[in-house]
Amino acid sequence: MSTWPIDAISKKPSVSLDYGIIGACQLLNPSGYHRAEKVENNEWTFARYDSYTGVELVDLDKRWDILSLNPNYKLPKLTELPAEATNSTRKATSSSFGLSVCRYVPRNLFSTLAKESQLASSAESIYNPHILNTFCLGKTAPSDKNRYTTTECLACSKISNETAENLLFLCLSSPWIFRASPTLQNTATFEEFPFYLNVSAFEFAEDPIWKFSQPVRQLVFSNGEPSLLFALSSCELVIFQVTYDLMFLDEPNTPGCLSAIPLRFLYADDVYNSDSFANVSVHPTDNSFFLTTSSSGRWTIWQFLDDGYRECFGSSFKESLQQALCSAPTSSIAYHEEEINPDNTIYRAKWEEYFGGVILHNAFFILHVSLGEVPDFHLLFHCSSDVRILQVVNESMPIKSEFFILTTESVLWMDIQHPQKPLLEWKHNRKLDPTLKITVTATFSQNIYVSVYSQMNGVVQQIHFSKDRALPVSGSHPFLLLNEVQVPIRSLIIQPCYFFESSEFDRQGPFDSPFWSAIIDKADGSLSLHILCEKSSLKIYNLEELTGSSQVAMKFKTITPSVNTSEDDSANDQEIISTPNSDFQQLSLSRLYHVLCSNRNKKNTITLDEFASKVPDFVEAFDSINHDVIITLSELYDGFPLKGTFTNVAEIISHLEGTELSFYFPYMFGINYNNASFFYTSVDSIASLIHRRWESNTDKSVEIPCFQSSQRRSIKNVIHYLFLSSIGVSREKIFDPSLSRKEIDSTDLLTFIKPFYDTEGLELNEDVRNILENWEIGKISSTYVIGDSAVETEDPSSSQFSDFYISQQQSSVLPSSQIATVFSQEDVPNFSSLYSESSSQTIPIMSQVVSGKYGSRPSKKKKKRSGF
């Protein structure tokens, strides 16, 4: 899946961090030799090869000696793989000797890639290709009692574990739409690596609004008023009107209830005889029109009437394709007869808003139907025989004529005005995964984010598309957002968290927040919300929940106290920390210090017993804190009291043997404490503090071995709780490494989780550390050179251990032969005149580096002078 710019650099040792994972690798030179002298820390166990036929498995024994951290881990045998994968592996092995780019996969991702290497038939037990989505978001229509309130809600289909019935539920949107704002400027962040927050956010009604005899294939909300919900199964289509009613009209902030009234019923046996429904699409501006598609390719446009509905237009995909091929130039496309009549293909139809027509597609062709007195059929796209079309998305596009295509090979950015001419193509290199899907989020007219995710393993990569001077560009590297690799995904929606600077919330404002909210419906039946951060930031953000009528329901605050300990600064810290309107109060070390170190007898001192007695009193002032997770120090020292005087909390912590915070938060390396004050300035040196040995300044007769393991664990729990609260995490149970992954997920835990969580510690070699120090997910860091300290290199071209580098590519502008023209609504050209003969130009592929003075453009030629 790697598309780093180094893929196109020849004769240079390189490495690919697939899926954007933070991992380690053993660097190799083009000859296949290890660059570093010590390779015992090599954690990469499997290699794969990206060729013109896709992602293939490489026979490791012929080229590389791969070591594993786990001595019991066994490499798979090629004979255990399907025959097709084995053949492609041998081809890749035989052709890989002349290549210099080697790719490796970490051991904790091997099982994921092994799934991608299987044939499509082996994935049928994991996913159902006929199910388009299992939940959707939409706005409810104001009722007569509540005319001025619109509320976003979620519709979700579930299968009952007891009765195996297919149920449809509704849920209010709160609290899964978040917005982010910077609360402090020019301050260091605590978490310097990407993180996400798990939030328990869904409360469904006990009773479903409908029961289906067959699994729900698609859920769609209409855009206009009234708000309609289309629920489609293989045999029936039910259309609901969804409203939200307040329980008490005089109190707008009181809870309300969702209601769904079925308006229309369509049965596949009535409209398509023995055929079944494939998908449904609602007109983007007029709710009275919608279209359906059958599994055999028949598509029909319907219109609502007061007494029912009527059929406006209908045809079959085969007839539409034949008319489109007749109108297309014969030299512009070459196709096979089996593509005209494919077996076991899936048909889809959807509205497009630019011309008010319909887009049809199967696995090989994409058509456009211009509706009028005489419908026009045009061919938009045709893929090669070894590529299949998986999905077409045109919703939420800022320019209505544009859409995205997901194929088994790449993601294509298309424009209806330019058939067969993609604006941009990005190869995802996941050809062997038939479960890929995309979701498109357009923040504003210049930024479009396409998320490609796998239903088999849950790995998500996000691609950023934009335009620079009307030319399509993509300057961001795909990065990992979610990584529940062990649980397949049924549906996924990713939304940005917007910035707000005032009480008014404008979705059309500029988008520069690194936060995203993702709703995931997993195969195990769970529905969860994740707040994700794509990269580290120098700002501190305040995440606020948005509801339909109210403002804030919860806050996640990150607080960095000032280094200055003056009274004025302390007062500022108190003001920042105080959040009286928040449901979740934040417990910070700075406020704890001011409470504990009260000026008694004009001495800023406190004994350990006083500290123990003050902690429970301070904790009880906060209703949101779970008292069960707090073990007070007074209970710990009842049988073993300590006498001592401490000037600040830092000294108390320094007297506690290693808290192992690095185990709980792998990326939280340290907090600096000043001798005169506990205020910390950075998170880069916590290791020097938490690994400090116990040095008793109190009673020399006290011996540390007297402490029992349970007492040490309780002390750690208290300190962990203080640190968790100081970085903006509250209302959680202390993470217990003895808990299983399932138990951890079931707890109400708000914490920073590293990608691909692994309880085993990883020891990184020198080359690996050099890579990871300057690398972030979602961002190609500045140009850096990683060399071998044991080898001196003067001439990279002649040296066996040449320098390894990655060139920064923030934005590469790839010109198109024909710039997309955006027409105004008043001056829309004739549709048929826009279709011209396809050009044979090479599609710009962003995984390639464009070199040369003029990039991919030809060099400028001097004009010939005419005249005398």
Swiss-Prot record:
Its main location: cytoplasm. One of its GO terms (cellular component) is cytosol. InterPro entries: RNA_pol_I-sp_TIF_RRN6-like (IPR019350), RRN6_beta-prop (IPR048535), RRN6_HB (IPR048537), Rrn6_K-rich (IPR048536). One of its GO terms (molecular function) is RNA polymerase I transcription regulatory region sequence-specific DNA binding. Keywords: Cytoplasm, Nucleus. Disulfide bonds: none annotated. GO terms for biological process: nucleolar large rRNA transcription by RNA polymerase I; transcription initiation at RNA polymerase I promoter. It is found in: Cytoplasm; Nucleus. PANTHER family: RNA POLYMERASE I-SPECIFIC TRANSCRIPTION INITIATION FACTOR RRN6. This is Uncharacterized protein C3B8.11. It comes from Schizosaccharomyces pombe (strain 972 / ATCC 24843) (Fission yeast).
